[in-house]
Curated annotation (Swiss-Prot):
This is Probable peptidoglycan glycosyltransferase FtsW. Pfam families: FTSW_RODA_SPOVE (PF01098). Pathway: Cell wall biogenesis; peptidoglycan biosynthesis. The chain crosses the membrane at residues 93-113, 128-148, 159-179, 193-215, 224-244, 248-268, 271-291, 350-370, 399-419, 426-446. It catalyses: [GlcNAc-(1->4)-Mur2Ac(oyl-L-Ala-gamma-D-Glu-L-Lys-D-Ala-D-Ala)](n)-di-trans,octa-cis-undecaprenyl diphosphate + beta-D-GlcNAc-(1->4)-Mur2Ac(oyl-L-Ala-gamma-D-Glu-L-Lys-D-Ala-D-Ala)-di-trans,octa-cis-undecaprenyl diphosphate = [GlcNAc-(1->4)-Mur2Ac(oyl-L-Ala-gamma-D-Glu-L-Lys-D-Ala-D-Ala)](n+1)-di-trans,octa-cis-undecaprenyl diphosphate + di-trans,octa-cis-undecaprenyl diphosphate + H(+). Residues 1-28 are annotated as: Disordered. The lineage of its organism: Bacteria, Pseudomonadati, Pseudomonadota, Betaproteobacteria, Burkholderiales.
Length: 462
């Protein structure tokens, strides 16, 4: 005969202990209680009778409710996307730009420290050019902060107006007694404490206007009369005004920006090829018809010839000597000999030669890599904007990259003897108020494009 199963004794509360492993109604297993807790519960069972059972039940209910609420909250929080750690804009681009600006401050001071020894600057202090350069940097920083706060849509809206303002500036600089001439070129408008160079404004204006034009005329990009010809006329007009200064270097940069943006905007391939051929033919004709430009080409081809070494090729020969003295690691910061009134414009057009002499091949290579990074990031930001269907922003960003790439390439080519001498500064590095100002504004516009890209990718609005 089978023995009866053992039935647990009832406690004073009238309740049985749940069986081991049985799930509690609030989702908690009874065996999760430690042995000491169970022992205390057995001894205090009688005390729980009557009024003691209700508080304990309420406490358990509250604990279970809190657990359920916590679980629900964790489920909801798990379904919610985590906060984005995306930066507001590309800080690597910002720091590379700051590095070039900082290098420019050091090298401008080094390259200009001996200039007061010449009769032309005898009244200047040793740090006069450094002080002016630092003031230009402060003004450029303030302008860049303001430009960064301007939405890209505003630049798009007022692009034609900015182009017209820059065009008027190119006309004003040619008016006698208004435009300031230096070394036979009339490129500056005196503004009291500083000089403004309208060609620098035109570089930014044509970058923005070319992007705006390409977007407005997108359906006519395959047409010669409606798509290609109006922009070609605008660039030709700008080129004519720049050549009257004369400023061939600025014209080459402006033409490169306009042609590059049109090409990236989808202009007809045959029309673009015709534009390139026309530009090359125009430059060739200008060189051939101008005796002094022709002499400069001959001097570039053979700078060590006795006829040119002390004349048209004087800057080039001393620039090459500076690079030769620098070798791999340079003669040391401040140790340049060519800047001691041997190399003209050492703090502006030929500052790379001073960098090569004092910091050597390694220093020049670092400068090249920094500019490469700016150009690369410009195109990446532009491509990202195009992927977000922001055609104007994308073309404008790439236009900034073309601007910096073309001007840096021409300046470096001139310093290294790869290109004929042109009056172009090295962006962000060379001494100059207008150049530094417009370079910083253009980088601020580029960072604004990147900022808006990131806002849109986070699901925001601009």
């Amino acid at each position: 005969m089978r023995e009866p199963r053992h039935v647990p004794q009832l406690r004073a509360s009238g309740r049985r202990f749940p069986q081991r492993g049985r799930r509690h109604r609030f989702g908690k297993r009874n065996d999760a209680m430690s042995w000491s807790d169970r022992l205390v519960s057995r001894f205090n069972g009688a005390r729980d009778a009557g009024g003691g059972a209700a508080p304990r039940t309420a406490a358990r209910a509250a604990s279970g409710a809190r657990a359920a609420a916590g679980g629900l909250a964790s489920v909801v929080n798990g379904a919610r996307p985590t906060r984005s750690r995306m930066l507001d804009f590309d800080y690597s681009l910002l720091w590379v730009s700051i590095a070039l600006l900082g290098l420019g401050v050091v090298m401008v001071y080094s390259a200009s420290i001996a200039m007061p020894d010449s009769p032309k600057y005898a009244s200047y202090h040793d740090y006069a050019f450094l002080l002016r350069h630092c003031v230009s940097l402060v003004v450029a920083f303030v302008a860049a902060v303001i430009a960064f706060r301007v939405p890209v849509s505003t630049w798009d809206k007022y692009a034609p107006h900015l182009f017209l303002i820059a065009l008027v500036g190119l006309v004003i600089v040619l008016i006698p007694h208004i435009g300031k001439g230096v070394n036979g070129a009339r490129r500056w408008i005196p503004l009291g404490i500083t000089n403004m160079q309208p060609s620098e404004i035109m570089k930014l204006a044509v970058t923005i206007y070319a992007a705006n034009y390409t977007v407005r005329k997108q359906e006519y990009m395959q047409s010669f009369a409606k798509g290609f010809l109006p922009m070609a006329f605008a660039v030709g007009l700008v080129g004519a005004l720049l050549l009257l200064e004369p400023d061939m270097g600025a014209f080459m940069v402006v033409a490169a920006i306009a042609m590059g943006v049109l090409f990236l905007g989808g202009v007809n391939g045959k029309l673009f090829g015709g534009l390139v051929a026309t530009a090359v033919g125009t430059f060739t004709m200008l060189v051939w018809l101008s005796p002094w430009r022709r002499e400069r080409i001959f001097a570039y081809l053979d700078p060590w010839d006795e006829r040119y070494a002390q004349g048209k090729a004087y800057q080039l020969t001393h620039s090459l000597i500076a690079f030769g003295r620098g070798e791999w690691f340079g003669v040391g910061l401040g140790g340049s000999v060519e800047k001691l009134n041997y190399l003209p414009e050492a703090h502006t057009d030929f500052i790379l030669a001073v960098i090569g002499e004092e910091l050597g091949f390694v220093g020049v290579l670092v400068v090249i890599l920094l500019f490469y990074w700016i150009v690369r990031r410009s195109f990446e930001i532009g491509r990202q904007a195009l992927a977000l269907d922001r055609t104007f922003a994308g073309l404008m960003a790439k236009g900034v990259g073309i601007w910096f790439g073309a001007q840096a390439f021409i300046n470096m080519g001139v310093n290294l003897g790869l290109l004929p001498t042109k009056g172009l500064t090295l962006p962000l590095v060379s001494y100059g108020g207008s150049g530094i100002l417009l370079n910083c504004i253009s980088l601020a516009v580029l960072l604004r494009v990147d900022y808006e890209n990131r806002v849109l990718m986070r699901g925001g609005k601009v």
